[in-house]
A protein has these predicted regions:
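N-terminal first-folded block
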Residues: 16-47, 52-56, 65
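C-terminal end-helix/capping segment
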Residues: 80, 87-92, 126-154
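Beta-rich strand-turn-strand
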Residues: 86-123, 127-129
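Intrinsically disordered, Lys/Arg-rich N-terminal extensions and targeting peptides
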Residues: 1-33, 141-154
Length: 154
């Protein structure tokens, strides 16, 4: 069977763009079990409560829920276990230096297949306050309204 080419989106964390000011993004591989990959091929994963952390010089993705594979047997994986992020040492050090500042966290924004391998896009984010969220929504609505009016004039 030929190796799959290109990118295939598994799950997108749109909530992260709403809740955080995202700055620095990095692509990381994931150390997964076979049944986890099969469950991801079915498109089953939840990034809602997920975050990344650096522990003992290693990066971990915590809170990623990958449900058990339906055709798996008793060797099925634990759905909520922490998963190791595969990053270069300098990338881990750079992310850790940014996260040590107060208010910053590592947020997974996307989970996707790239050339047959599971990748996670991790971003450094600072939490938005309520008035920031309201302003973003108001700006988006105003932009939509302007586009509607421009289309109506044509």
């Amino acid at each position: 069977m030929a190796k799959p080419q290109g990118e295939k989106l598994i799950v997108d964390n749109r909530r992260a763009r709403h809740d955080y000011h995202l700055t620095d993004k990095v692509e990381a591989g994931l150390a997964l079990a076979g049944t986890e990959v099969k469950a991801l091929r079915d498109g089953k994963a939840t990034l809602q409560q997920a975050y990344a952390e650096v522990r003992d010089g290693e990066a971990w993705l915590v809170g990623l829920h990958i449900p058990e594979y339906g055709q798996g047997n008793r060797a099925n994986h634990d759905p909520d276990r922490p998963r190791k992020l595969l990053l270069h040492r300098r990338e881990i050090d750079r992310l850790y230096a940014q996260v040590r500042e107060k208010g910053f966290t590592l947020v997974p924004t996307r989970l996707y297949f790239k050339d047959g391998r599971v990748k996670a896009e991790i971003a450094v984010g600072r939490g938005k306050e309520l008035h920031d969220k309201r302003r973003a929504i108001a700006d988006r609505d105003a932009k939509r309204q302007m586009e509607r009016e421009l289309r109506a004039r044509r």
